[in-house]
Amino acid sequence: MKRIVFIRGFVFTLLFSLVCLGANCAQLGWSNDLRSLFAGNKSVIYALNIRSFGAEDTNGDDIIEPLDGDKKGTFLNAIPGLKELTKLGINTVYLLPVTKTGKLKALGTAGSLYALDSFDRLSPLLDDKDNPMSVEQEAKMFVDEAHKLGLRVIVDIPSCGSYDMSLEQPDLFIKDKNGNTVVPADWTDVRLFKVYDENGKLNRALVENYQKMIKMLQDIGVDGIRADVAAIKPYEFWKEVIDYARMKDPQFIFIAEACPTWTNPAKQWGDYETVPRLLEAGFDGYYGDWANFSDFTKSKDVIKRIKSDLKISKEFNKQKSTMASFATHDQQSVIVRGGVPLWEMITWLNVTLPLNPYFLDGYVTGDSYIYRYENKKADRSSTDDDYYFVHRGKFDIFNFSRRPEGNYAELKEKFVKAMKFKYWAKSVLVDGKFVEFKTSNPSVFAYARKNGDDAVVVIGNLNKEHEVDANVYIRNLKDTSFISPVKMGEAPIVKRGKMSVSLKPYEVQVYMLNKVNF
């Protein structure tokens, strides 16, 4: 047994600048390729809220109030931030909903982004009032500028209508036995759409309105959509909507906010479509089951989810894939849940797992999403809610908030390093097969991505409180095997067929192996 001699920095001496790394360089004439990119796990997705992405908080109180000299986020002032995303290795921008939002029974002073109030109007709150263009023209300019940088653009479409819409278009909504529209789960600001009419047939008005929304988004040039709570609408509904979209753009992507293990938030009002049926309807992908990752304690919790997603992908001839969901706007900040160690682990899982990485605005610098105005009474409001409603530690989708940014500037360098490695090792991390390794400690997971004689090995400790020791069993590993550290704390001890590691709480280690056979 001996301690391997490592050549530190070997991998990164071979890396190149991040210029045009995540996105293709500017193209003459845009050609959407997002479905192909996503199926091959080659998209790197960055989610942002136009309301906040270009906002300027001049007095540092976290809330954006123009009367106090602040600037609200708009499509136009979001454009300058796009170039920075390409430097981070991003190639796909995911916009949280940009449609008009309701003002009645609202949550927050701007209203939830998901309280849909119009199928064919963008939110006037995202318009630059100092510019003569319409908000639709400004949105198209944003998309065009993204495309010039090689960035694809997808838009989130809500699953339910606002209370305002339920008053204006009652025939679109389910009614209970008392004739009242239905609140799904505890989403008190929205009402549940009626998918089937009284004869058990698809509600044509709803289908046509969703098609109208797709047309509006295609008219401004976007490359696809993410469907919120997609499973509360059935196969036949989505089949019609997706077929409609693909007549104009065969590469127009549909990503379902759905997961094989999730349950119906409105089960008494309808069935919940399965992920395979959504994929059969034409969806290109869904959410991996990572929302509760910080609650995982056993290696099997990680491995079984990877295998489940790979099984579904295989059933669809590898033409469908998943989007990472470790840190979306629905979860508390990674920093709140587990600090920098959890942030590092989730970053490297995004980089090395067979899925499409996803990062929320503010993630790169470790935003806690804790706002100074949290649930305080507001002096002014654009809705009937006069409180700054937010979920503690979660990305604000209810108010005019500051641009997300954390207090961990040093994390940006770590993020860029991880993304550089992802692109440098893409032949392994994109094209390589997934290999599970057994470990001697149930809280330690280990796997490899292998292509030919090269492999990337990832080892992580799910114990959030204690340092642990573990053996990782790697068939045919030799004392003389060439191992280069990508991310490492204490060097492992290597003997035939085994790596012995010591891992701090939530520590992840990453190695590049050459000339391996396992």
Model-derived features with residue positions:
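Asparagine-centered strand-capping/turn motif at beta-strand->loop junctions
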Residues: 459-464
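Active-site-adjacent "subsite" loops/lids of carbohydrate-active enzymes
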Residues: 163-222, 230-231
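Active-site-proximal helices and loops of the catalytic beta/alpha 8
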Residues: 28, 143, 212-215, 228-322, ...
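C-terminal beta-strand-rich structural cap/linker in extracellular carbohydrate-active enzymes
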Residues: 494-518
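Aromatic- and acidic-residue-enriched segments that line the glycan-binding/catalytic groove
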Residues: 101-120, 159-187, 267-282, 372-386
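Bacterial N-terminal signal peptides
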Residues: 10-21
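N-terminal structural segment of carbohydrate-active enzymes
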Residues: 26-152, 160, 506, 514
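The substrate-binding groove and active-site-proximal loops of carbohydrate-active enzymes
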Residues: 51-75, 115-136, 190-207, 222-232, ...
